[in-house]
Amino acid sequence: MENLDALVSQALEAVQSAEDINALEQIRVQYLGKKGELTQVMKTLGNLPAEERPQVGALINVAKERVTGVLNARMALFEEAELAAKLSAESIDVTLPGRGQTSGGLHPVTRTLERIEQFFTHIGYGIAEGPEVEDDYHNFEALNIPGHHPARSMHDTFYFNANMLLRTHTSPVQVRTMESKKPPIRIVCPGRVYRSDSDITHSPMFHQVEGLLVDRDINFADLKGTIEEFLRVFFEKELAVRFRPSYFPFTEPSAEVDMECVMCSGKGCRVCKQTGWLEVMGCGMVHPNVLRMSGIDPEEFSGFAFGMGVERLAMLRYGVNDLRLFFDNDLRFLAQFR
């Protein structure tokens, strides 16, 4: 047992003199490992008489626990010191400015849609929606578009079959509203529409807002005043507006609406092709045939309708020269509209 006491004293002295964790690990292996000195002492129990083994074994276990306890305590001190040094080296200067979170923003097309809807709801219009997959009747027939009209061509319309297609305008929503409600009707119909066309000013899918007002004694002056006020509020400036005679199957009379170029104030530039004018929408008085097919008596009621491309207005408002930029999902472009 004297040898055991000497061995324990030697081990404790080695633990106290250790200068780092690596040295402690070597001491642990030397005294407590599988081939460690204290472990070897335990293996000598077989040489002792049977009656002495329990007592001697208990003493050896106490010795091992003592060395293990001191070694672990010393190890904990080194680990705490090492952690403190590491934390000190990696300290954060909380006075430095933080990165902050980048906030998102509405897509310019969404902004434009909301701006249009806000104006018309403010003057008493409701918002109506309808299916994007339409039948031939509501997309063409009910809007006085004859079978030989170019819009029915496969080159301009996406067909599923002979009767079902992707709507080419939001006018079917107007028809469905007139079929289900009695005048007076005041609605705008925002939504996605689809046409087989793609270039810098056209996309196979784009957004459109169409408006409809049906009531007694509605005339072209009401239409003219509504559109002029909308353009003034939307572009936040006084703009000259002109109505050019045009043709749409679902309105009579029909007109294209031009406004003074917002880029050059009507002086002529590349955007307006040196004319000083920009085409912004189509409009007209609702054709009697359209009213009649929707169950409204054209002798008693009249109305006007208009339609505008949302991307077109967004391009003019924000000075964007390629419609396809709106759908490229390039954050460098979209971040400009936050």
UniProtKB/Swiss-Prot annotation:
Gene transcribed to yield this protein: pheS
Keyword ATP-binding: yes
Main location: cytoplasm
Enzymatic reactions: tRNA(Phe) + L-phenylalanine + ATP = L-phenylalanyl-tRNA(Phe) + AMP + diphosphate + H(+)
A GO biological-process term: phenylalanyl-tRNA aminoacylation
Subcellular location: Cytoplasm
Subunit composition and interactions: Tetramer of two alpha and two beta subunits.
E.C. no: 6.1.1.20
Taxonomic superkingdom: Bacteria
GO molecular function, one term: tRNA binding
Signal sequence bounds: none
NCBIfam families the UniProt entry points to: pheS
Residues noted as binding Mg(2+) in the record, renumbered to the chain: 252
Cofactor(s) required for function per UniProt: Mg(2+)
HAMAP family: Phe_tRNA_synth_alpha1 (MF_00281)
Keywords in alphabetical order: Aminoacyl-tRNA synthetase, ATP-binding, Cytoplasm, Ligase, Magnesium, Metal-binding, Nucleotide-binding, Protein biosynthesis
GO CC annotation terms, alphabetical: cytoplasm
InterPro entries in the cross-refs: aa-tRNA-synth_II, aa-tRNA-synth_II/BPL/LPL, Phe-tRNA-synth_IIc_asu, Phe-tRNA_ligase_II_N, Phe_tRNA_ligase_alpha1_bac, Phenylalanyl-tRNA_Synthase, tRNA-bd_arm
SUPFAM superfamilies recorded: Class II aaRS and biotin synthetases, tRNA-binding arm
Family: Belongs to the class-II aminoacyl-tRNA synthetase family. Phe-tRNA synthetase alpha subunit type 1 subfamily.
Broad enzyme group: ligase
Cited Pfam families: Phe_tRNA-synt_N, tRNA-synt_2d
Protein name: Phenylalanine--tRNA ligase alpha subunit
Co-factor binding details: Binds 2 magnesium ions per tetramer.
